[in-house]
A protein has these predicted regions:
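Terminal, low-structured helical/coil segments at or just beyond the last alpha-helical repeat
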Residues: 22, 121-155
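Alpha-helical segment of the N-proximal tetratricopeptide repeat
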Residues: 21-40, 44-47, 51
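Short helix-capping/linker turns of helical repeat alpha-solenoids
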Residues: 20, 32-33, 51-53, 66-68, ...
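Hydrophobic face of amphipathic alpha-helices that form TPR/SEL1-like repeat modules
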Residues: 24-32, 59-66, 95-102, 136-137, ...
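TPR/TPR-like (Sel1-like) alpha-helical repeat modules
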Residues: 94, 98, 108-128
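Sec-dependent N-terminal signal peptides
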Residues: 4-13
């Protein structure tokens, strides 16, 4: 019985340390990314993303989406956004909607785009910010208008 308890405790400690190191890797990668040191940021973000860190998956997806520090790869960006979005990260849901709307890294599918945009906007933390940004951008670009029309928020 004591062995089982110690084994459980060891596993819990191991998972906690792994999560902490993923957070540290992400924070270092984000710091480098914000300094526009993309090539240095990518390995840190990749390591954190491999550990399941949703923000690292999103940020690494942005790197592949824009070609920051890596060769642009729409399919890889889509896959990373999807992993992050499945962990309920609104920013990734929004980017996933854009991928489906434009057919970037995946076949264009307006219904899937609409679904992901709505999920992003309904997110308690980030949804209002996304909606405000879209409405502000509407005056400057047709993409924002297209997204707002697609989700029925074009008022």
């Amino acid at each position: 019985m004591t062995r089982l308890f110690l084994l459980s405790l060891l596993m819990l400690f191991s998972m906690t340390m792994s999560a902490q190191s993923a957070d540290k890797l992400y924070e270092e990668g984000k710091r480098l990314y914000d300094l526009e040191q993309y090539k240095e940021a990518v390995p840190k973000l990749q390591a954190a993303a491999d550990k399941g860190h949703y923000k690292a998956q999103y940020r690494l997806g942005r790197c592949y989406d824009k070609g920051d520090g890596v060769k642009e790869n729409d399919q890889k960006a889509f896959e990373l956004y999807l992993k992050s979005a499945k962990q309920d990260y609104a920013k990734a849901m929004y980017q996933l909607g854009r991928c489906y709307m434009k057919g970037k890294g995946v076949a264009a599918n307006q219904e899937e785009a609409k679904k992901w945009f709505k999920r992003a906007i309904n997110d308690i933390k980030h949804g209002d910010d996304i909606l405000k940004d879209l409405r502000k951008a509407k005056a400057d670009g047709e993409e924002a208008t297209r997204i707002l029309t697609l989700i029925g928020k074009n008022k």
